[in-house]
């Protein structure tokens, strides 16, 4: 029996929510281990649409325990809002089926304000974030001045922790000519919200260790994608956390032995939100056609996603940096009807062919994709639930992707619906 990690193998938005929801039927516990409420999922279940940003997808299934790990940055108001909306849709969410790491870092209003300031300034600091305070909160975490969930339970030490936090932020704000923040106001806000949050607080590493020893199946749910990893992604156009599979252990308080199988998610094409290099981007009618068919708009932000052809080089790189055992290929149906489909198999950089994506920002901007043209298919793949339902040419496309990225396809998704999934290899039984 393998504990399974699900990670994005592109720039996020690969359809992790649906796949995690589909796999969660076999899991006992679903764990979020990094990121914040900047990465959204849209799930369609029995015709009902659910939008998640911070909560694990396990909350959509009864009888499952969902956990937010210590690697996440946690916005109290966003959490309460999301819980409230899902409860209004009839879901039962309580401390009985949702636990939050007591040592999770909190996102405060000052983090959101700083994030927005950087994105709107003309100083060259904008990189296309969601302005939700994710990066500034992680900065405070590694700077050892963050407020954590457990701090709300100790009102004797909380004022001192707020003062320590503001010693940094007010110095920064003073230099930027901004109004200074009153620590008493932060204290009032946190004191007011504490009774609503603390019932969810848990020593997560201990809880998960106990459950593992009891033989419970764990499903780790990543946010964003490997190409947004702060170390291995398209730096500086990345998120502020490690998004690769190894972070599942760190972000949940478990050792690497807790990971048994890594499932990577990728679309049958490529999308990206925000700024940064995108070698196969199609800023043309093809890109617009893919975007319209795939409804490529951010779940949280509504921003249109940039669209392009499948990049086998980048996905192959993600397979290596994440230790991916199998891929779940999503949105194959969006390519239905194309006469031909392009797949990037390599790059040219300054006249030379290379087989990997360079780390340097300048080199990333100069790479040119080398394409292989593949014949398309006319028959629909939408709603297919077995290989027999797929056109022969679509199967050839899937097999060619396997060859190019050096990794087998374990799952194939053909619509947003939970059941429109073709299983090749069950990750929990691998």
From Swiss-Prot:
EC main class here is ligase
Enumerate composition-biased segments (Basic and acidic residues): 285-296
Q: Which family does it belong to?
A: Belongs to the adenylosuccinate synthetase family.
Cofactor remark from the record? Binds 1 Mg(2+) ion per subunit.
Give a yes or no for keyword Magnesium in this entry.
yes
* This protein's GO CC annotations: cytoplasm
Annotated TM spans: none
Q: Which GO terms describe its biological process?
A: 'de novo' AMP biosynthetic process; IMP metabolic process
Q: Which reaction does it catalyse?
A: IMP + L-aspartate + GTP = N(6)-(1,2-dicarboxyethyl)-AMP + GDP + phosphate + 2 H(+)
Write out the annotated subcellular location. Cytoplasm
User: Binding positions for IMP?
Assistant: 13-16, 38-41, 130, 144, 224, 239, 303
Instruction: Return the annotated region ranges for Disordered.
Output: 277-297
Q: Which cofactor does it need?
A: Mg(2+)
> Known Pfam families for this protein?
Adenylsucc_synt (PF00709)
Annotated residues for binding of Mg(2+): 13, 40
Annotated active site residues, numbered on this chain, are: 13 (proton acceptor), 41 (proton donor)
* Record pathway: Purine metabolism; AMP biosynthesis via de novo pathway; AMP from IMP: step 1/2
Protein's name according to its UniProt entry: Adenylosuccinate synthetase
Q: Which HAMAP family match?
A: Adenylosucc_synth
């Amino acid at each position: 029996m393998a504990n399974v990690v699900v990670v994005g193998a592109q720039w996020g938005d690969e359809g992790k929510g649906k796949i995690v929801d589909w796999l969660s039927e076999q899991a006992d516990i679903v764990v979020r281990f990094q990121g914040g409420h900047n990465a959204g999922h849209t799930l369609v279940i029995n015709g009902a649409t659910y939008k998640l940003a911070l909560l694990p997808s396990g909350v959509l299934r009864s009888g499952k325990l969902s956990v937010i790990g210590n690697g996440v940055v946690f916005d109290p108001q966003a959490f309460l809002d999301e819980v409230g909306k899902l409860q209004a849709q009839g879901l039962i969410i309580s401390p009985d089926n949702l636990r939050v790491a007591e040592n999770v870092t909190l996102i405060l209003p000052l983090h959101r304000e700083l994030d927005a300031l950087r994105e709107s300034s003309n100083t060259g600091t904008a990189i296309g974030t969601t302005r939700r305070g994710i990066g500034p909160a992680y900065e405070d975490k590694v700077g050892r001045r963050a407020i954590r969930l457990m701090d709300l339970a100790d009102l004797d030490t909380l004022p001192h922790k707020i003062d320590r936090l503001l010693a940094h932020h007010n110095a920064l704000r003073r230099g930027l000519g901004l109004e200074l923040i009153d620590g008493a106001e932060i204290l009032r806000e946190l004191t007011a919200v504490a009774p609503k949050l603390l019932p969810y607080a848990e020593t997560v590493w201990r809880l998960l260790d106990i459950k593992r020893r009891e033989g419970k199946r764990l499903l780790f749910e990543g946010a964003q994608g490997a190409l947004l990893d702060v170390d291995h992604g398209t730096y500086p156009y990345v998120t502020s956390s490690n998004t690769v599979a190894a972070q599942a252990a760190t972000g949940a308080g478990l050792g690497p032995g807790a990971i048994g199988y890594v499932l990577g998610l990728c679309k049958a094409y490529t999308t990206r939100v925000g700024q940064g290099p995108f070698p196969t981007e199609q800023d043309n009618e093809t890109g617009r056609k893919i975007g319209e068919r795939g409804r490529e708009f951010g779940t949280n932000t509504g921003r249109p996603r940039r669209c392009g052809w499948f990049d086998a080089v980048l996905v192959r790189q993600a397979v290596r940096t994440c230790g991916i055992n199998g891929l779940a290929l999503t949105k194959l149906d969006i390519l239905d009807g194309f006469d031909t489909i392009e797949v990037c198999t390599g790059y040219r950089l300054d006249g030379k062919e290379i087989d990997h994506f360079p780390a340097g920002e300048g080199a990333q901007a100069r790479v040119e994709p080398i394409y292989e043209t593949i014949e398309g298919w006319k028959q629909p793949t939408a709603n297919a639930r077995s290989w027999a339902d797929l056109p022969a040419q679509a199967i050839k496309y899937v097999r060619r992707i396997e060859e190019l990225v050096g990794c087998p396809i374990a799952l194939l998704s053909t619509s947003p619906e939970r059941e429109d999934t073709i299983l090749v290899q069950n990750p929990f039984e691998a």
